[in-house]
């Protein structure tokens, strides 16, 4: 398996795991907020504001995962080393 194939697989798996955690976290946050509003409708404004801030912080996990995966795919610092190693092995 080549270096670039492993980079593509790592980026795909990393993005899948990052978005899986984000989806689960956001689902749990919304579930808790809905339960809180149903128990105390008078506090809905404060609960929803806090939930939105929390969702933004949870969503940052997916953004960080995307950035790392894009770095792995397009700006990999080990690309030159891998190409030199492949040329050396080919000789």
From Swiss-Prot:
- Subunit: F-type ATPases have 2 components, F(1) - the catalytic core - and F(0) - the membrane proton channel. F(1) has five subunits: alpha(3), beta(3), gamma(1), delta(1), epsilon(1). F(0) has three main subunits: a(1), b(2) and c(10-14). The alpha and beta chains form an alternating ring which encloses part of the gamma chain. F(1) is attached to F(0) by a central stalk formed by the gamma and epsilon chains, while a peripheral stalk is formed by the delta and b chains.
Pfam family, any one = ATP-synt_C
UniProt site positions, description: Reversibly protonated during proton transport: 59
| Protein name per its UniProtKB record | ATP synthase subunit c
Sorted keywords for this record are: ATP synthesis, Cell inner membrane, Cell membrane, CF(0), Hydrogen ion transport, Ion transport, Lipid-binding, Membrane, Transmembrane, Transmembrane helix, Transport
Q: Has keyword Cell division?
A: no
Offer an example of a GO molecular function term for this protein: proton-transporting ATP synthase activity, rotational mechanism
Per its UniProt record, what InterPro entries does this chain match?
A: ATP_synth_csu_bac/chlpt (IPR005953), ATP_synth_F0_csu (IPR000454), ATP_synth_F0_csu_DDCD_BS (IPR020537), ATPase_proteolipid_c-like_dom (IPR002379), F/V-ATP_Csub_sf (IPR035921)
Record's function text: F(1)F(0) ATP synthase produces ATP from ADP in the presence of a proton or sodium gradient. F-type ATPases consist of two structural domains, F(1) containing the extramembraneous catalytic core and F(0) containing the membrane proton channel, linked together by a central stalk and a peripheral stalk. During catalysis, ATP synthesis in the catalytic domain of F(1) is coupled via a rotary mechanism of the central stalk subunits to proton translocation.
> Where in or outside the cell is it found?
Cell inner membrane
Gene3D superfamilies on file:
lithium bound rotor ring of v- atpase (1.20.120.610)
Membrane association type: Multi-pass membrane protein
The primary site where this protein sits is: membrane
Q: Name one GO cellular component term.
A: proton-transporting two-sector ATPase complex, proton-transporting domain
Q: Which family does it belong to?
A: Belongs to the ATPase C chain family.
- Which PANTHER family does the annotation name? ATP SYNTHASE LIPID-BINDING PROTEIN, MITOCHONDRIAL, ATPASE PROTEIN 9
* Transmembrane portions of the chain: 4-24, 53-73
């Amino acid at each position: 398996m080549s270096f670039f194939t492993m980079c593509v697989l790592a980026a795909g798996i990393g993005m899948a795991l990052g978005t899986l955690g984000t989806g689960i976290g956001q689902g749990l946050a919304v579930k808790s907020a809905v339960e809180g509003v149903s128990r105390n409708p008078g506090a809905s404004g404060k609960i929803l504001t806090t939930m939105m801030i929390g969702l933004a912080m949870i969503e940052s996990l997916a953004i960080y995962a995307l950035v790392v995966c894009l770095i792995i795919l397009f700006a990999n610092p080990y690309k030159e080393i891998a190409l030199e190693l492949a040329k050396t092995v080919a000789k």
